[in-house]
């Protein structure tokens, strides 16, 4: 599993010109599910993301998590995180999980984040989306379960 974590001042996602998710300060997550991912991978990444200390404390050191800050999360499914570009010029997405499995694990990931105490907004799985964010920093971290 791969989660591209972006610290954001705000973020939103639209489907068919309708806003389906909107957050203030927090994290924008692009979430990719691998074909061999399991519930353990999902739980690991949710725990890591929720407790990742990438927000500044009162001493201006990256020492606080999104939970510490009371921030929220915008979670977007993103199978293209498993695009392999080693051969040719068109990415190969064979390592990405099939949609049925990916949707189930993506929903479990978001549920785990909520269980940890986060407010989670999402895009629409499998839809063409317009994602907007204002990066904060910028701070961008790749969390992987493998």
Curated annotation (Swiss-Prot):
Chief place where the protein resides: cytoplasm
Cell compartment(s), UniProt: Cytoplasm
Catalytic reaction list: glycyl-tRNA(Ala) + H2O = tRNA(Ala) + glycine + H(+); a D-aminoacyl-tRNA + H2O = a tRNA + a D-alpha-amino acid + H(+)
Sequence motif Gly-cisPro motif, important for rejection of L-amino acids, residues: 137-138
GO biological process terms on file: D-amino acid catabolic process
One annotated GO molecular function: Ser(Gly)-tRNA(Ala) hydrolase activity
Documented EC number(s): 3.1.1.96
Gene Ontology, cellular component aspect: cytoplasm
Keywords, comma-separated and alphabetical: Cytoplasm, Hydrolase, RNA-binding, tRNA-binding
This protein's domain notes: A Gly-cisPro motif from one monomer fits into the active site of the other monomer to allow specific chiral rejection of L-amino acids.
NCBIfam families: D-aminoacyl-tRNA deacylase (TIGR00256)
HAMAP family per the UniProt record, alphabetical: Deacylase_Dtd
UniProt subunit comment: Homodimer.
Functional summary from the UniProt entry: An aminoacyl-tRNA editing enzyme that deacylates mischarged D-aminoacyl-tRNAs. Also deacylates mischarged glycyl-tRNA(Ala), protecting cells against glycine mischarging by AlaRS. Acts via tRNA-based rather than protein-based catalysis; rejects L-amino acids rather than detecting D-amino acids in the active site. By recycling D-aminoacyl-tRNA to D-amino acids and free tRNA molecules, this enzyme counteracts the toxicity associated with the formation of D-aminoacyl-tRNA entities in vivo and helps enforce protein L-homochirality.
PANTHER family, sorted: D-AMINOACYL-TRNA DEACYLASE 1, D-TYROSYL-TRNA TYR DEACYLASE
Protein name per UniProt: D-aminoacyl-tRNA deacylase
Species the sequence originates in: Shouchella clausii (strain KSM-K16) (Alkalihalobacillus clausii)
